[in-house]
Amino acid sequence: MKVGIFMGSKSDLDTVSAAFGILDEFGVEYEYNILSAHRTPAQVINKITELEEKGAKVFIGAAGMAAHLSGVIAAHTHKPVLGIPLGGGAMGLSLIHI
């Protein structure tokens, strides 16, 4: 597994699932999880560790309103983290600070 994908809620799946086809097309292994940095932070942290043990090389955090999910991921790994803003909130401006 090369890419660990995190989404903050089920409503993010419709948007992020478009990336799955691209990853499949290039033969990139991935696993996605729907976990909230606000509601389930311990589960996010545990999943990061689990995915690194499975060989994750990069993480993607996609959530609406703010970049907290990507920030939590980045705080708990030395691997690259890509943050994807999904509307709402500050229009993704909080990602600039990561």
List where the protein language model places each region.
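Generic alpha-helix signal with a bias toward terminal, lower-confidence helices
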Residues: 18-19, 23, 42-47, 81, ...
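Short glycine/serine/threonine-rich phosphate/pyrophosphate-binding segments
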Residues: 12-16, 41-42, 63-72, 90-94
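Glycine-rich phosphate-binding loop
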Residues: 47-89
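N-terminal beta-loop-helix "entrance" segment that forms/cooperates
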Residues: 32-52
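Glycine-rich phosphate/diphosphate-binding loop of Rossmann-like nucleotide-binding domains
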Residues: 1-31, 36-37
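Conserved small/polar residues in nucleotide/adenosyl-binding loops
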Residues: 96-98
